[in-house]
Amino acid sequence: DEKKSQIAHGETVRETANMVSFMADVIGIRDDMYIGKGHAYQKEFMEAVTEGNKDGILEQRPTLVNLQCDVDHPTQCMADMLHIIHEFGGVENLKGKKIAMTWAYSPSYGKPLSVPQGVIGLMTRFGMDVVLAHPEGYDVMPEVEEIAKKNAEKNGGSFTKTNDMAEAFKDADIVYPKSWAPFAAMEKRTD
């Protein structure tokens, strides 16, 4: 929580990053609340420790684990992928499998976009047929959709979007329901 850290008192990211790095080989950061902030902070943090290592301030550059940011949730998505690989009997059996990444209602509003974005980005890398299904207005970041499209083309899968849940569920091998806030709402929260 930045409000309880030295950042709230004017300490720079570089100062914080280097100080924490003196005490750790691995650092995990979770910063997912604001569009354009979390991933950018993680990059700035790693640039600071890389520079600190190059300048001789740090003996070594620690590894950063993205525990979740505004763009992706790689630890969750990799755990999901390992489960899927196991269930289908190996990574070679994933090509052509259909996964429906579907929006689901939750009484707690304002969930980050990182899980559905991570899923569509990762599963398309394995040649899966990924369908992103959500009500109108619940789009994810356009840049992430472009990554999913490119991954699908490169790896022999597909990426499609729909607002029709029945269409998404039809012939799906996997249905992954998850609540998330609309991209437009997340952008407003950031402003």
Please report, for each region that a protein language model flagged, where it lies by residue.
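Phosphate/diphosphate ligand-binding glycine-rich loop within oxidoreductases
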Residues: 1-85
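Short, well-ordered coil/turn residues at beta-beta hairpins
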Residues: 30, 177-178
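Glycine-rich phosphate/diphosphate-binding loop of Rossmann-like nucleotide-binding domains
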Residues: 1, 85-177, 183
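Glycine/threonine-rich flexible loop motifs
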Residues: 37-39, 108-113, 182-191
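Generic, ordered loop/turn and secondary-structure boundary motif
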Residues: 14, 65, 139, 181-184
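Flexible, active-site-proximal loop/turn residues at the rims of small-molecule/cofactor binding pockets
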Residues: 33, 180-181
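Detector for methionine-enriched segments
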Residues: 19, 23, 33, 46, ...
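Charged helix-capping and loop-helix junction motifs
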Residues: 11-15, 113-118, 191
